[in-house]
Regions:
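Hydrophobic h-region of N-terminal signal peptides that target proteins for export
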Residues: 20-23
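Secondary-structure end/capping motifs
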Residues: 225-302
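N-terminal secretory signal peptides and thylakoid transit peptides that target proteins
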Residues: 1-18
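Solvent-exposed, polar/charged alpha-helical surfaces in well-ordered, non-transmembrane soluble domains
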Residues: 76, 80, 94, 128, ...
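Sec/Tat signal peptide C-region and signal peptidase I cleavage site
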Residues: 25-30
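Short, glycine-/small- and polar/acidic-enriched structural segments
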Residues: 32-157, 162-168, 181-188, 198-204, ...
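Pocket-lining segment of extracytoplasmic ligand-binding domains
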Residues: 91-92, 169-258
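Conserved C-terminal helix/tail region of periplasmic/extracytoplasmic solute-binding proteins
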Residues: 296-322
Length: 322
């Protein structure tokens, strides 16, 4: 009798165990996908480093590069967290920070990359020759502030020229059509105008106290406080990609031709006027402050940014040379 009970209990227990095995939800081990980093870039040659990012992404991460037409659009994408990081002009960064937006500059992207170009045979050889001429200037950009300062240095103001609002990508075309007499542009536009013979160089506007400061690399303040490791990873990628592009001109030209849709000759004409860099040193910070002072004097901003929080060099300072 006892053996029957034990046998019955054993079979019942076995059935219960099988039932549990059949109906219980199995434990599924899911492999986590890579961490996706979204980076904004501009359709300009001095924003070409982001297109090399994917060559330097460490294991466990994936990079997505999103192109933007204007610096303000890229900066706004950072502010709204549409991207995690972005490359844009110092002007867009200062405008945002002065308005209280949580944008933080954590590295540099490029110096130089600007030029004042005139229509060939238009008799424009210097800034003073622009008086009364139609000059394309894109408002709210780094180039605009440099141009206004160069006018001031020559005893002129914006009222001495006829400013025409034209985006960087359209300036060469407008010059070719005769819609404008000159423009204050961003590479590769000037390189296209010079290599095609349509334009002539008036000057590279780097003689001001702002030097050749141009593009910076920024993120949202929340990314710094909540994801500092992500910032460190991104800075490592940015540093390696920037150094690679800066020291491999052929690769830089090929990438720019592919991504920007310009002829090799035009890109080659632009490269000498582009200084790719990730370093954010005391000189660049001082130039940024001078730049912000100019924007305040021009009433483009109502107050200066708080530079104690606007620029954070801690991540760049921690990057080890490769």
């Amino acid at each position: 009798m006892t053996s029957r009970i034990r046998r019955r209990e054993f079979l019942a227990g076995l059935g219960a165990g099988l039932g549990a095995g059949l109906f219980a939800r199995p434990a599924i081990v899911r492999a986590e996908g890579p961490v996706v980093i979204r980076a904004g870039a501009l359709k300009l040659i001095h924003s070409i480093a982001p297109y090399f990012y994917d060559q330097f992404v460490p294991a466990g991460y994936k990079i997505e590069v999103l192109p933007f037409e204007t610096p303000t659009e890229c900066k706004n994408a950072v502010v709204t967290k549409s991207v995690d990081f972005g490359a844009f002009g110092i002007a867009a960064a200062v405008l945002g920070a002065a308005a209280g937006e949580p944008v933080v500059v954590i590295a540099s992207t490029c110096n130089r990359g600007m030029a004042i170009i005139a229509k060939k045979d238009a008799g424009i050889a210097a800034i003073k020759d622009l008086k009364g001429k139609r000059v394309a200037v894109f408002p709210g950009t780094t180039q605009e502030v440099f141009f206004l300062e160069r006018l001031r240095m020559e005893g002129m103001t914006i009222k001495d020229v006829e400013p025409v609002r034209v985006s960087f990508s359209e300036m060469h075309i407008a010059l070719s059509r005769g819609d404008i007499d000159a423009y204050v542009g961003a590479e590769p536009g000037p390189g296209v105008s010079l290599s095609s013979g349509v334009g002539t160089l008036v000057e590279y506007p780097y003689s001001t106290a702002m030097g050749s400061l141009n593009m910076v690399f920024g993120t949202h303040r929340d990314v710094i406080t909540q994801k500092p490791e992500l910032v460190r990873v991104m800075l490592g990628i940015h540093q390696r990609a920037t150094d690679y592009a800066a020291t491999n001109k052929d690769a830089m030209v090929a990438m720019a031709s592919s991504k920007l849709g310009q002829k090799k000759e035009a890109i080659e004409a632009s490269v000498p006027n582009v200084e790719l860099t990730w370093k954010l040193e005391a000189k660049q910070i001082e130039q940024s402050k001078i730049y912000a002072d100019h924007m305040l004097a021009l009433k483009q901003i109502k107050r200066l940014p708080d530079f104690a929080t606007f620029i954070d060099t801690s991540f760049v300072d921690a990057v080890k040379p490769t």
